[in-house]
Curated annotation (Swiss-Prot):
Annotated organism of origin: Desulfovibrio desulfuricans (strain ATCC 27774 / DSM 6949 / MB)
Gene transcribed to yield this protein: greA
GO biological process per UniProt: DNA-templated transcription elongation; regulation of DNA-templated transcription elongation
Entry keyword set: Coiled coil, DNA-binding, Transcription, Transcription regulation
Designated name of the protein: Transcription elongation factor GreA
Gene3D superfamilies assigned: Transcription elongation factor, GreA/GreB, C-terminal domain, Transcription elongation factor, GreA/GreB, N-terminal domain
Entry function: Necessary for efficient RNA polymerase transcription elongation past template-encoded arresting sites. The arresting sites in DNA have the property of trapping a certain fraction of elongating RNA polymerases that pass through, resulting in locked ternary complexes. Cleavage of the nascent transcript by cleavage factors such as GreA or GreB allows the resumption of elongation from the new 3'terminus. GreA releases sequences of 2 to 3 nucleotides.
Residue stretches in coiled coil: 9-38
């Protein structure tokens, strides 16, 4: 069984989501019961919506619970070094356009590119792992092949997260 790194903050967020989803179960069951009492289930939008909500919640609960056993929780405040690893913040420059980007390398269940974090499993994340300042990486992304120069590698810890 392969472990999946996750930050302390990411793990806590998933624990909170799991608790919230479990606490919503009685409310969802009540909504299904009330919709069922309205009669014909074939044309009962309230019933269909409540069942769909239940299915989505149960699927997410099952997913989170199955992942919890695989996580290796890492305290980002204890990391340091010169190489890109899980938890590193990497400053990049697109060699062709000069565009600057900064990413923190996190796990797949906590990465959010819109907030500046990417998964170590993403194409860019995989290309960066093990590299250091001054290295160039070339990676295939949806808009085509791009080459980045690593301008800096730092470890800002948990204060750098959302």
């Amino acid at each position: 069984m392969t472990s999946i790194p996750i930050s302390v903050q990411g793990y806590k967020a998933l624990e909170e989501e799991l608790a919230r989803l479990k606490s919503e179960r009685p409310e969802i069951i009540q909504a299904i019961k009330e919709a069922r009492e309205e009669g014909d289930l074939r044309e009962n939008a309230g019933y269909d919506a409540a069942r769909e909500r239940q299915g989505m919640a149960e699927a997410r609960i099952k997913y989170i619970e199955s992942r919890m056993a695989l996580y290796q929780v890492i305290d980002l405040d204890t990391l340091s070094g010169d190489k890109v690893i899980f938890g590193a913040t990497v400053d990049l420059e697109d060699v062709d356009s000069g565009e600057a980007k900064t990413y923190t390398i996190l796990g797949p269940d906590e990465a959010d590119p819109s907030k500046g974090s990417i998964s170590f499993l993403s194409p860019v994340g995989q290309a960066l792992l093990g590299r250091e300042e001054g290295d160039e990486v070339s990676v295939e992304i949806p808009r085509g092949r791009v080459t980045y120069e690593i301008i800096g590698v730092s470890f800002k810890g948990s204060k750098n997260l959302g």
